[in-house]
Amino acid sequence: MTEFDNLTWLHGKPQGSGLLKANPEDFVVVEDLGFTPDGEGEHILLRILKNGCNTRFVADALAKFLKIHAREVSFAGQKDKHAVTEQWLCARVPGKEMPDFSAFQLEGCKVLEYARHKRKLRLGALKGNAFTLVLREISDRRDVETRLQAIRDGGVPNYFGAQRFGIGGSNLQGALRWAQSNAPVRDRNKRSFWLSAARSALFNQIVHQRLKKPDFNQVVDGDALQLAGRGSWFVATSEELPELQRRVDEKELMITASLPGSGEWGTQRAALAFEQDAIAQETVLQSLLLREKVEASRRAMLLYPQQLSWNWWDDVTVELRFWLPAGSFATSVVRELINTMGDYAHIAE
């Protein structure tokens, strides 16, 4: 298995280094749910600004304030403790009376707005995230500038970031230990983290191998293609390749890579053979996903940051702004720009 730091770069390995997250204000994330609260229902959606608090900590504090069980507070995604983040939490509080959230006091946390909603907010149920990042101590401004232009046009690999695998790869190591054992994992969080790390590592490996090919973005017979911004896909046939290639070049369609598991992978013929060969040696992780009945799925191979802009504060400091769809990683954009000083596996998704 190729280490995250050695996965293929789309624009070549960066020439310079830089620092990500010198302080929390250098990493700002604003959740975009893609919908507005219903204004009625037994749940309450709260938009919360936090600094120095991780998501689970805030959710537990909110549950305690509302005198409800922790499982009655949900969120769409984990956000990092060492960042400034705006995200939505959801609490199940039946009844007409609205709690007085001005009395909710937690250091580093502020309730910005709240409203009733009919449905529970589930993990992954958001449109995307808007990022404002500051990269400091950049050693090669010219190289970063060139890469930003290239990313605007060509995107970046849609890798799962190092944080998916835990500090020091602990989640992936946990998955490997579990795969080689018949002992059940009763901790639901560990089970989820380990299975996610296993599938993500296999996806990264498939993308890594495809990006090694000079014609990586050429549609091949049996590729699974996805309409940009959609989750469903269809299979390319040899008769359609010229027209499908035109649509891929125009970013209307995206070539996908497998999120392996049980069931059909989605690709066929030449594309399926390539994906199977790319992870042929990773039998332990594949067996785990089959054993635990994790359903196979697809994910776009490339990621195009939307609304990408940047502003140089000086020759060694640049502020980046961009929007990414849910499930994509800002750190996978940053790794195409600089060799990051320090380990950012601690950054939450």
From Swiss-Prot:
GO terms for biological process: pseudouridine synthesis; tRNA pseudouridine synthesis. One of its GO terms (cellular component) is cytosol. One of its GO terms (molecular function) is tRNA pseudouridine(13) synthase activity. Residues 155-303 form the TRUD domain. Substrate binds at F27, N129, F329. The active site is at D80. It comes from the Bacteria. Keywords: Isomerase, tRNA processing. CDD domains: PseudoU_synth_EcTruD. It catalyses: uridine(13) in tRNA = pseudouridine(13) in tRNA. InterPro entries: PsdUridine_synth_cat_dom_sf, PsdUridine_synth_TruD, PsdUridine_synth_TruD_CS, PsdUridine_synth_TruD_insert, TruD_catalytic, TruD_insert_sf, TruD_pseudoU_synthase. It holds the Pfam family TruD. Its EC number is 5.4.99.27. Gene3D superfamilies: TruD, catalytic domain, TruD, insertion domain. Responsible for synthesis of pseudouridine from uracil-13 in transfer RNAs. Belongs to the pseudouridine synthase TruD family. This is tRNA pseudouridine synthase D. It comes from Salmonella typhimurium (strain LT2 / SGSC1412 / ATCC 700720). The lineage of its organism: Bacteria, Pseudomonadati, Pseudomonadota, Gammaproteobacteria, Enterobacterales. The gene is truD.
